[in-house]
Amino acid sequence: MPAITLPDGSVRHYDAPVTGTTIAADIGPGLARAALAMKVDGRMMDLSRAIAADAQVVFVTRKDEAALEMIRHDAAHVLAEAVQELFPGTQVTIGPSIENGFYYDFARNEPFTPEDLPAIEAKMREIIARNAPFEREVWDRQDAIRFFQDKGEKYKAQLIQDLPDTETITVYRQGEWLDLCRGPHMRSTGDIGPAFRLMKVAGAYWRGDHRNAMLSRIYGTAWRDQKELDAYLHQLEEAERRDHRRLGKEMDLFHIQEEAVGSIFWHKKGWRLYRALENYMRRRQIEAGYEEVRTPQLVDRSLWEDSGHWDKYREHMFIATVEDEEKTLALKPMNCPCHVQIFRHGLRSYKELPLRMAEFGACHRYEPSGALHGIMRVRSFTQDDAHIFCMPEQIAKETADFVAMLASVYRDLGFDSFRVKFADRPESRAGKDEDWDRAEHELREACRLAGVEYELNPGEGAFYGPKLEFVLRDAIGRDWQCGTLQVDYVLPERLNAEYVAEDGARRRPVMLHRAILGSFERFIGILIEQYAGRFPLWLAPVPVVVAPIVSDANAYAMEVVTALKRAGVTWAEADLRNEKINAKIREHSLAHVPVILVVGRREAEQRQVALRRLGSQEQQVMALDEAISALATEATPPDLRQ
């Protein structure tokens, strides 16, 4: 009979299978009221499920982070019930919890509109108030298929048909309504609480395939209490204010147009920002012992077949056929196979390892148009990509050195902290299990020796190896996964990379794939939103504008600009237009220019400037030399400051 071990180490013995509800009640009435679900040996389960064997049990209450996913999952079910009550004949498809919320996809003749959301949300609150219990039922597979087919729910029937034969078919009832679901769920609809809101409608293809029917998706957000909901809604407002697409337009940084969907037209100011970041990263990599290379954009399919990308990644590749040569080429989606070709060009010695090879490599990956998002999710992008060819005993030091470099770069760019996730082997992968065992062991050991603490991200490794994912948190609390480090024994084997070891034998190098920014385009989008367009001088596309009050000061304004440029403030500008000074200040403030130097006759005569910072109404009168020295220091990239 089951022995139930609780988090405090105490053990409760039962003479028969026991439910979580009973255990919680035995512990005390407070827990019986607060418990929403339970973890049984680490697996989330309904409180109503019976435990028949010895197990470790942890109860989940509203205070626990794990409750959020339960609240959102249950809210998705209530959303589906509300829609079917209000819009009979609507078919339900899938409705998962997602980061910060949930959604449900519906099949109906007319898509939902934002105007439908208030009524649906009101109906959801009505269903929650009914406090109907969630009840789990196990059904026969064929009975379940017939049931949903008879209801006209063809998508649910298809989902069941596609499940493995070994999968148990379960449905959950909430009052008179039910849905196909693996669970788990909380006790009742009332446990969801009032802290939710429907956010928007969108279109989505069934199973994400553009060849399938277009469905109507409703997104919502749900939280543990009103305070959390209000904080999230405030974050969304702040995110809208910082949206890189809007700021990019206001600051004249870039644009995107239909003739090149998923690719960026960089304007001169945006390209200045891009180049400032690229030059900074180039210096940091040179300092860390990387050699920069350049590899082709179009590569024959044979290399992608050898590397495994053709099988695992072909649907994301842009492919071209050269008819007169009967060749099939692909725009490279990543740089690693090409870097192996450089490593293989000539006989390598163990004395050359670790060999650190870097490239600001342009890559192309197909993304559905609906998934594209400004410059953050595109089809054509450049990575700060590098590969370290090393021996197994060098992995730990290279990992530690990389993490130290990454942390320093992030600090320079305005991010003081980051989290690390360990992504292990995915279901679809290349290589032998023993190679994966070795790679995962080596990466865990490298993390231990480097003092890197991580959380597990199961099944999210690359198809050729496990990886560390470095997650930034921005100024408004959003997480961005940017940097990566991957350990790869597979690609050197597939592409026949080798070196001569100290004993004269030929050996395979270990390949470490690493990036700090990820893609320049996405990271610049993150930077725009992190700073809300208010860049530090060293990154600002226009760091300083000199604005004369009267035309008599134009010559002095140009002299100031020349002095700034000589001091290293390369993109300083003068605004010599015949406009009132307040209009100039307003215009350049809206363009997020960090510093405006106001000059008039008196400033010209006394060799001074009136310095005005973005967001401030105050002007600081300074000697010209003093101002130039201070601004030149601010405009110097952090890695070049003394």
Swiss-Prot record:
Its cofactor is Zn(2+). It is an enzyme of class 6 (ligase). It comes from the Bacteria. It catalyses: tRNA(Thr) + L-threonine + ATP = L-threonyl-tRNA(Thr) + AMP + diphosphate + H(+). Its main location: cytoplasm. It is found in: Cytoplasm. GO terms for molecular function: ATP binding; metal ion binding; threonine-tRNA ligase activity; tRNA binding. Binds 1 zinc ion per subunit. Zn(2+) binds at residues 336, 387, 513. One of its GO terms (biological process) is threonyl-tRNA aminoacylation. Residues 1-61 form the TGS domain. Coiled coil: none annotated. One of its GO terms (cellular component) is cytoplasm. Keywords: Aminoacyl-tRNA synthetase, ATP-binding, Cytoplasm, Ligase, Metal-binding, Nucleotide-binding, Protein biosynthesis, RNA-binding, tRNA-binding, Zinc. SUPFAM superfamilies: Class II aaRS ABD-related, Class II aaRS and biotin synthetases, TGS-like, ThrRS/AlaRS common domain. Residues 243-536 are annotated as: Catalytic. Its EC number is 6.1.1.3. NCBIfam families: thrS. Catalyzes the attachment of threonine to tRNA(Thr) in a two-step reaction: L-threonine is first activated by ATP to form Thr-AMP and then transferred to the acceptor end of tRNA(Thr). Also edits incorrectly charged L-seryl-tRNA(Thr). PANTHER family: THREONINE--TRNA LIGASE, CHLOROPLASTIC_MITOCHONDRIAL 2, THREONINE-TRNA LIGASE. Belongs to the class-II aminoacyl-tRNA synthetase family. Homodimer. This is Threonine--tRNA ligase.
